[in-house]
Amino acid sequence: MTDKAGVERAVGALRAIGYYLERDRQPTHRVKAYRRAADTIAALPASEVRARRRAGTLTELAGIGPKTEAVIVEAMDGATPAYLVKLEEAAGELTSAGKRMRAALQADLHLHSEWSDGGSPIEEMARTAYRLGHKYLALTDHSPRLTVANGLSRERRLQQLEVVAELNKKLQAELDGFTILNGIEVDINEDGTLDCDTEILARLDVVVASVHSKLRMAAEPMTERMVRAIANPHVDVLGHCTGRLITGARGTRPESEFDAEVVFEACRQFGTAVEINSRPERLDPPKRLLSLAVEMDCVFSIDTDAHAPGQLDWQVYGCERAEDCGVTPERVINTWDQQELLEWTAP
């Protein structure tokens, strides 16, 4: 095996371990340790990595510890690292339900990269989505007001559009036409306006609008706030509508109060999809509201809201809830092919 091939095997093994740890909701610091090790050796000449492997000095590099060193050594020797084998064998299905819906999905329309508060490059998110069977995805990094999530300024958003355009040339050639759609998760301001100027919104393919602030405001103004956003012709998806948190490191958070019938009627009338958010700590909307949206003839988008590659596999949780509540594949916009979706999202 050449030095280059050995290093590529090691980088791939380290990233795969990170993927399985993310998928299993392991602590972030554990995931980052393997990703950091992958980045460290990927940035070095292959000959140097090989020399350090032979001399036993890999751990002298920043970001390489005994556990990650063991993975690198096994991979460079041509073996599948024992820890990766263990994780692969333990992975299994996240849930046995939702398979029919998951098989119908062609995309994920809500995910984040390292440009905002995600943990991985755009390309890595895209390649993982392709490996999971998707044909396209929407990159929806945060809008500028959400500074805690490193929301993109106008200048950074324009820069990202250029980066995605170049990356798509590469991915479409290498991954059977796989495409990254330009998107945003835009904050719904307190008055229902959007945290992004119209010129930028008009250049995006998919706009997910979400409430991230003043979550405990009274039901009447919250309803008005959400309806105003839904009525905006640029908005395609209403993200995690109740804002609830039911588990996880951030603790729990109650649902925002709003008139669900009014909000879902606005979604139906203005052609805005109700997101079925698949994150385990959200699972939003609750089943009683999801069933109501089904009764009111809404359309849906089943998304992961992934912030890392391993989280892209969580989509099946949303699929399970969709099937439980009577959502059929034809009413889920990310079961549609890319052209049909883009025709639907066009203002």
Question: For each of these PLM feature ranges, what is it?
Answer:
Residues T2-G6, P81, V85-A104, I122, ...:
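Charged catalytic cores and adjacent phosphate/nucleic-acid-binding surfaces used
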Residues M1-R100:
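Long, highly charged, low-complexity intrinsically disordered interaction regions
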Residues A138-L139, I184-V186:
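Core AdoMet radical
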Residues E114-S116, H307-A308:
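Short strand->helix junction
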Residues L109-W115, Y136-T140:
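Ser/Thr-glycine-rich phosphate-binding loops at phosphate-binding pockets of nucleotides
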